Amino acid sequence: MRDPWPRLRELPFPPLRRRALTTLQVNLGYRCNIACLHCHVNAGPTRKEEMTRETIDLVLRFLAEQRVRTLDLTGGSPEMNPHFRDLVRQARAMGVHVMDRLNPTIVEEPGYEDLPDFFVEQRLELVASLPCYLEDNVDAQRGDGVFASSIRVLQQLNQRGYGQPDSGLILNLVYNPQGPSLPPPQVALEADYRRVLGERFGLVFNQLYTLANMPIKRFGSVLLSRGQFDDYMTLLQGAHRDENLEQVMCRDLISVDWQG
């Protein structure tokens, strides 16, 4: 696998000033039940890296001492870490808002079928990846059957109140392009998602986030191998808008990897 980091270090980026810390993002490990082309940490079923119990205890201590308002859990599939549920319970007991960056298909894996009930019990905010509303596009990016599985799980979540008006159970979806291109305008694409998913599957959700693929790790390596890295970086730089810097996550977020 080719490393894009040396090329990224050469690129200019406008200086940023941090704000007060509000969110702690924690990567609980690189294990995932699927392996996606765009994944920026090379997650997959064969990865073994995961956060230990000792490091999770440090996370909880940090939450308490720094009075962080939001815990943002990611992976891999964060739910595959054996300490996921205990971390969530303890964080929620502190009054911390917890977000789970969810690959919906994990719910259909053996041993994870009760996750929707756990999500409701702890009132987690779910950020579920669904990179398109068309089956062929999703399965081409993530593997055969991923779209159908994702839809079934999202329907389960809707049945438990997620995404429903006035339930307080937040279900947001995430779109990302299949390749080295920019996502469509978010407002228009969200309307398309609502129409297609609602008409075909009866699905509802709170909000759609559109993300550009990060040119690092697996996706960055593919770009380098295909000779598309420079063109993609030019595309990203051409789309830069200074006003978007107000919303950059790293200004009030600290991201912690599985090693702590």
Model-derived features: positions:
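Conserved alpha-helical substructure of the radical SAM core
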Residues: 1-75, 79-96
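Core AdoMet radical
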Residues: 23, 43-52, 66-81, 92-111, ...
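Generic structural signal for well-ordered alpha-helices
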Residues: 24, 60, 88, 116, ...
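Short loop/turn motifs at secondary-structure junctions
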Residues: 35, 67, 122-123, 167-170, ...
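Conserved strand-to-helix beginnings and helix N-cap segments that scaffold or border functional pockets
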Residues: 81-85, 112-113, 183-187
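Radical SAM enzyme [4Fe-4S]-AdoMet core and its adjacent flexible, acidic
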Residues: 134-252
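Short, acidic, Ser/Thr-enriched surface-loop or helix-capping motifs
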Residues: 256-258
